[in-house]
A protein has these predicted regions:
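Conserved alpha/beta-domain cores
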Residues: 1-185, 190-192, 198-200
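Expand to "…catalyze enediolate/carbanion chemistry for C-C bond making/breaking, isomerization
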Residues: 198, 211-216
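Divalent-metal-activated hydrolytic enzyme cores
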Residues: 203-204
């Protein structure tokens, strides 16, 4: 058998064998997959799922979250300002917080909707021009603004390393930045490198193709 549940359980076993110091949460990246395809994993009892487009997530998960209030949705893609209200309504975690305008919009809608999401600050640790994320040199000031000025709940940092390079040095750097801010969680590692990410302290890994297969 090679169902999505089988593949998920194999990943869980691999993670357990690493004996991580902290609990590692597997975010099943369900973006682009129909709910009918994902359902066996929900029925298996898995609760953490990731999406990168707000509109797709609304269509897929709004009713499902009413049925199962224990589901936890993670926004892992770039969040546009005009989608923030809907995102705050639906999601439990945002992994792509990286600028003051977005932070202000989230804080405003959280207050209006009486929500308190958990957030990761995305760091552009590879200094890639085309990639989202706050520059390392601006991280401390942005973190302090989010926490002390607008009362966002920042639980950790997030990184997507440059594709063409080995991720280890970026994972190590993010771990050090995370410790410097005394944060408990790290969002890093995907299907190709989640094992390495966990070795460097990741507590949330974002796994898609290793569970669901290739996207058409």
């Amino acid at each position: 058998m090679n169902t999505i549940v089988d593949r998920f359980e194999k990943i869980k076993s691999k993670i357990t064998s690493l004996k991580p110091n902290k609990t590692v949460n597997i975010i099943a990246l369900s973006k682009t997959f129909r709910l009918s395809y994902i359902s066996p994993l929900i029925e298996h009892g898995h609760l953490h799922f990731g999406e990168n487009k707000v509109q797709e997530a609304l269509t897929k998960w709004t009713d499902q979250k009413k049925i199962n209030q224990n589901l936890r949705l993670h926004m892992i893609g770039k969040l546009q300002s005009n989608k923030v209200k809907d995102a705050v309504k639906l999601f439990d975690y945002i992994h792509s917080l990286d600028n003051q305008k977005l932070a202000d919009a989230i804080a405003k809608h959280q207050k209006n909707l009486n929500k308190n999401l958990e957030h990761f600050i995305q760091v552009n640790i590879g200094n890639e021009l085309q990639k989202s994320g706050i520059p390392v040199g601006e991280l401390d000031a942005f973190y302090n603004y989010c926490v002390n000025e607008i009362n966002l709940k920042i639980i950790g940092l997030m990184v997507i390393p440059p594709i063409e390079q080995k991720p280890d040095k970026y994972f190590k750097s993010l771990n050090e930045l995370n410790k410097s801010l005394s944060l408990e969680n790290i969002s890093m590692g995907m299907s190709a490198d989640y094992i390495e990410a966990i070795k460097y302290g990741s507590t949330f890994v974002r796994v898609g193709s290793s569970i669901f297969g290739s996207r058409s």
